[in-house]
Regions:
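Solvent-exposed, low-complexity, repeat-rich "mucin-like" stalks and linkers
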Residues: 1-116, 173-184
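A structural detector for beta-sheet-dominated domains
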Residues: 44, 52-54, 134-136, 150, ...
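Ligand-binding face of N-terminal immunoglobulin V-set domains in extracellular IgSF glycoproteins
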Residues: 108-113, 118-124, 131-132
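Extracellular/luminal low-complexity segments enriched in Ser/Thr/Pro
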Residues: 126-142
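A short beta-strand micro-motif common to beta-rich folds, especially ectodomain repeats
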Residues: 141-152
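Residue-level detector of short, conserved catalytic/binding motifs and their immediate flanks
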Residues: 145, 160, 183
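Short, exposed coil/turn segments at beta-strand boundaries within extracellular/luminal domains
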Residues: 153-160
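Short beta-strand edge segments in extracellular beta-sheet folds
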Residues: 161-171
Length: 184
């Protein structure tokens, strides 16, 4: 047993998802609907997880959030639309629905704790599918990993940061600034 309070809290947490039904990190309850996507997902328990193949936060409240990959600002130094790995403009939140983007496999790019994230898989399905992975109870600890979706030529189409921590990111903490203004 570890003397690390954070590691012990993670190991004691109730596991989420299963190998056949991973916990969807883009859904507040782990359900199938893609609600809110991100470039970084927080994991706070062992289990099986999945994330949709979406560019960053391009889905918000279950709808397309085009402001995540386009801009209403004009000028010579404005990238509009944002471009993908191949230099093509991003036209759709779902990676597979963009020109030259055909997901083929998911891989670990790096992790800062051994065996933090394992069993990484690309699962083909509607809208390009998803990536699933496991965070094992025996090796869970605070740490970070980057997982990528690649095409058949090993080009990275997009990547996501996975942060494993026992911190409750939904816990609202009131902060008071120097001017005595309170923020939640």
């Amino acid at each position: 047993i570890s003397n690390d309070l954070h590691e012990n809290a993670l190991k004691a947490a109730t596991a989420k998802g299963s190998e056949t039904t991973p916990y969807n990190l883009s859904n507040n309850t782990g359900g199938n609907t893609v609600e809110n996507t991100a470039n970084c997902y927080v994991v706070n328990a062992p289990g099986y997880y999945s994330l949709p193949l979406v560019y960053g936060n391009a889905i918000k409240n279950s709808a397309t959030n085009a402001s995540a990959y386009t801009s209403t600002v004009t000028g010579t130094n404005i990238l509009n639309p944002f471009i993908n790995h191949a230099g093509n403009g991003i036209t759709d939140p779902y990676i597979a629905n963009n020109n030259g983007c055909t997901p083929a496999k998911a891989e670990l790019v790096w992790q800062d704790a051994m065996n933090l994230v394992t069993d990484i898989k690309y699962n083909a399905d509607s809208n390009g599918g998803n990536i699933s992975f496991k965070v094992d109870r025996s090796s869970i600890r605070q740490g970070n990993a980057v997982i990528a979706i690649k095409d058949v030529s090993d080009a990275i189409l997009w990547s996501w940061h996975v942060w494993v921590t026992d911190e409750d990111i939904n816990d609202v903490i009131e902060i008071t600034n120097h001017q005595n203004v309170k923020y939640n």
